Amino acid sequence: MMKYRRKKKPKVCKLCQSKIDYVDYKDVKLLREFLTEKEKIIPRRVTGNCAKHQRMVKIAIKRARQMALLPYVKY
């Protein structure tokens, strides 16, 4: 029996849709959307971010962690 693959809908970058040019490390509410329950960064293929915004999110999360706005890990 062959299993049929379901066509996946292409994901759209949330940040491009809302026309955000810069991701600020102080915007903790936005950054938490891109973290798992254990505070790990969610990959681009899951979130649907474009490469440019994924890099900005990654850098902003790392800066926020250094400034103690976000935790490194949660157990």
From Swiss-Prot:
The keyword Ribonucleoprotein applies. InterPro entries: Ribosomal_bS18 (IPR001648), Ribosomal_bS18_sf (IPR036870). Gene3D superfamilies: Ribosomal protein S18 (4.10.640.10). One of its GO terms (molecular function) is structural constituent of ribosome. Pfam families: Ribosomal_S18. The keyword Transferase does not apply. GO terms for cellular component: cytosolic small ribosomal subunit. GO terms for biological process: translation. Belongs to the bacterial ribosomal protein bS18 family. Part of the 30S ribosomal subunit. Forms a tight heterodimer with protein bS6. Binds as a heterodimer with protein bS6 to the central domain of the 16S rRNA, where it helps stabilize the platform of the 30S subunit. This is Small ribosomal subunit protein bS18. It comes from Thermosipho melanesiensis (strain DSM 12029 / CIP 104789 / BI429).
